[in-house]
């Protein structure tokens, strides 16, 4: 497991700067991550995020009809409490999806026990689960370790928590940013997990943001929906949507001058996009981060549909893995995205190289482009491992970016052996 910070120097803005501290960088949050014996490996598998003074919570969730009960519990409790949530417990190794009535009972037993220990109401506690579908949570193991989990709560335990939520991930996914707004230092933290079964619809895998700003629940919910669209809903690894996809965001602190809310949202987008790209790059068996940029579409919605269609194309992804500048596969994916455009207006670049223009391929050196791709496939994680594909499809104002990864034979091996 690689715990190094992820190329923070490349992710800056005019206002927001990367800092250490992960999910607990903002004031008002503590975290913990321990081993409760849920994983045969003995690795950390139980995490807790806690806001002692309370927080405003909003989230987006999987649209799967076969979603796990923990997703319904989160949705119901956020709605019933108008976002007043103080804790979320996360177990890895057991998805607790498709486990019948037991899934509901187990989720409620764990949150009830945790609420008692923290002296909260059950409605203030959420639960998220990740792991093998059909496997129930070992409730006795979890509940017998809740005291240890609570005693491990600490401002410095952000890496413990980020490790405890992982399953097949090879990389820890955590980040924090800070800005000074109106003379006040504001921090945003995040952590996530995800490596396979990633093609979210309204959410993604398990992802968490924290912020030390007080925000109205309705306003916060609107922000988080927009953040999800520009980040977690813009990535794909394998085209599969999980039963447990959850993105939760917590805000706790003094209210911010409304003049700075747009800058706050910029920071939320920045943080979520870093986590989203980390997930896409850590796709099972992946060797590079694939970025699809679409410009000139009639709307952002059309551009997003095109970008995600190309990013999720198995033929495009395998061509990238083979360092093959096969523009035909990209154009074919463009054509089935369900949007209108004139092929004679289309221009295509792989990295800095223009490959296709005004409806016809250009005379380019395939070996040079292939070597460019090959170098990125052996690049350092989230530093020089980006292969960018850019399309201009017209003169419209619509644009969007999606992220994915190459598709290798290792992905097949990992998933063929997943439960065996």
Swiss-Prot record:
Its EC number is 2.3.1.35, 2.3.1.1. GO terms for biological process: L-arginine biosynthetic process; ornithine biosynthetic process. Pathway: Amino-acid biosynthesis; L-arginine biosynthesis; L-ornithine and N-acetyl-L-glutamate from L-glutamate and N(2)-acetyl-L-ornithine (cyclic): step 1/1; Amino-acid biosynthesis; L-arginine biosynthesis; N(2)-acetyl-L-ornithine from L-glutamate: step 1/4. Keywords: Acyltransferase, Amino-acid biosynthesis, Arginine biosynthesis, Autocatalytic cleavage, Cytoplasm, Multifunctional enzyme, Transferase. The active site is at 204 (nucleophile). It comes from the Bacteria. Substrate binds at residues 167, 193, 204, 284, 415, 420. The record marks 130-131 as: Involved in the stabilization of negative charge on the oxyanion by the formation of the oxyanion hole. It catalyses: N(2)-acetyl-L-ornithine + L-glutamate = N-acetyl-L-glutamate + L-ornithine; L-glutamate + acetyl-CoA = N-acetyl-L-glutamate + CoA + H(+). Pfam families: ArgJ. The record marks 203-204 as: Cleavage. PANTHER family: ARGININE BIOSYNTHESIS BIFUNCTIONAL PROTEIN ARGJ (PTHR23100), ARGININE BIOSYNTHESIS BIFUNCTIONAL PROTEIN ARGJ, MITOCHONDRIAL (PTHR23100:SF0). Catalyzes two activities which are involved in the cyclic version of arginine biosynthesis: the synthesis of N-acetylglutamate from glutamate and acetyl-CoA as the acetyl donor, and of ornithine by transacetylation between N(2)-acetylornithine and glutamate. This is Arginine biosynthesis bifunctional protein ArgJ. It comes from Prochlorococcus marinus (strain NATL2A). The gene is argJ.
